[in-house]
A protein has these predicted regions:
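Nucleotide-sugar-dependent
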Residues: 242, 293-328, 333-346
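A short, well-ordered alpha-helix in the C-terminal region of glycosyltransferases
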Residues: 364, 371, 378-392
């Protein structure tokens, strides 16, 4: 057979700033460039562009584009703030409807992949797969309704029951289910009834050729006044799942150490709340910086002495923070405020590349940050181990795992 045609359904894609959008963009680019696949994406319009620009393009119901050899069917939907349930629901449903129409165009797909942005988009992917008689894959970046149920702003049991029913249907219908780690695999098998023979674990990644250990004193740290500070950094989305209020409370506990600076880089629905919390507490050791362009990521990561990875209690196995892999690639130690039974904890313990703290416990998080602040030898050991671990999660290796799976499914389709 020739090169397989793979179709992805996911709202976030280039030039979206979200981690999932950037990961999907890198995956599609690798499948086209390194493996010769034909790749199409049914995407939405960006809510937040990675370049910080405002999206002013004409928005038809479905617009046809190409980016680095990837075909994009840009499906129109609302772009309200994700901070409210109504706004988020409107974004979900409007994109789902236009994406379902876009999916009617694919009659020759070999593999159709449904993702989880929004959590109902897998249904549109399933319909497209059945119409094209293609193999259907569900790729879980987040598992619903558990993620929504544990975030107090989005507790709606009627909606959550519908999401649970939808996900069980998608899992039963899928030829393969992709989980981001062993804990997520267990959640899908034992919690959702997935056939263990159909579940494949493929990790997220960082590109170790783009993000690598570098000197702390660089143009970014000098420009931001961070070169002579002990920088404790959170980089990426400031969303509902991380419990970042705990990080601000940690900043209050280390404020007497004048050279420690807590730095948030990125954006998200929780950023205004965190900024307000910092102002109300009168903290001078916390800074907020915007998303950095991809070409500046390596220097922004190198500016950190220590990173923080956090996840609210109860979300282990339902979300895997993708920022971990970039931290590993940068060769920096981190404190992971996560539950013990999760992918981040497993990687931390297996590779000895960070410290673990109790989730949503600012005192324990502060203790672990200070342990690294006071012990440069420990920091260096964890940093070296982090970079070694990153090579296992390098982008070409993980993209190759996706290609092998898609090729296997495409060949099986051609034989039927």
């Amino acid at each position: 057979m020739g090169s397989p045609h793979i179709v992805f359904f996911n709202r976030s894609f280039y030039p979206e700033a979200s981690a999932v959008g950037q990961l999907l963009t890198e995956l599609c680019d690798g499948l086209v460039r390194d493996h010769g696949c034909r790749v199409s994406v049914v995407a939405g319009y960006p809510l937040v562009r990675a370049d910080g620009e405002t999206d002013t393009r004409r928005r038809g119901l479905v617009e046809h584009e190409f980016f680095q050899g990837v075909e994009i069917l840009r499906s129109r939907g609302t772009t309200f703030s994700k901070a409210s349930f109504v706004g988020r629901a409107s974004n979900y449903v409007s994109y789902f409807l236009s994406a379902s129409l876009a999916g009617l165009r694919f009659k020759d797909a070999d593999v159709v992949v449904g993702m989880t942005d929004p959590p109902i988009i897998g249904l549109a992917a399933l319909f497209a797969a059945r119409r094209a008689r293609a193999k259907f894959v569900m790729l879980y970046q987040d598992v619903f309704p558990e993620v929504a149920r544990l975030l107090e702003d989005f507790r709606n049991e009627t909606v959550n029951r519908l999401l649970d029913t939808t996900n069980r249907l998608l899992i039963r219908s899928a030829d393969r289910v992709i989980a981001l780690g062993e804990t997520m695999r267990e959640r899908l098998v034992h919690g959702k009834g997935a056939d263990p023979r159909k579940v494949r674990v493929i990790h997220n990644w960082a590109d170790c050729s783009e993000i690598a250990p570098g000197p702390k004193r660089n143009s970014f740290s000098l420009a931001q006044g961070l070169a002579d500070k002990f920088v404790v950094m959170h980089s990426g989305n400031m969303g509902l799942s991380q419990g970042l209020e705990c990080v601000v409370q940690t900043a209050a506990r280390v404020k007497e150490f004048l050279d420690i600076q807590i730095v948030f880089i990125g954006d998200g629905v929780k950023k205004p709340t965190l900024e307000s919390q910092v102002r109300s507490m009168g903290l001078k050791n916390v800074r907020f910086l915007p998303y950095q362009p991809k070409e500046h990521l390596a220097e922004s990561f190198a500016s950190a002495n220590v990173f923080i990875v956090s996840l609210k209690r109860g979300l282990a196995g339902y979300i895997v923070p993708s920022k971990l892999y970039s931290i590993l690639a940068a060769g920096r130690p981190y404190v992971a405020a996560v539950e013990n039974a999760c992918e981040v904890a497993a990687i931390t313990e297996k590779y000895d590349c960070g410290l673990l703290a109790e989730p949503e416990d600012p005192e324990d998080l502060a203790d672990k940050v200070l342990a690294l602040y006071r012990d440069p030898v420990l920091c260096r050991r964890l940093a070296v181990n982090a970079r070694k671990a990153a090579l296992y999660f390098d982008r070409p290796r993980q993209v190759g795992a996706y290609y092998s799976l898609f090729r296997e499914l495409a060949e099986a389709r051609s034989e039927t």
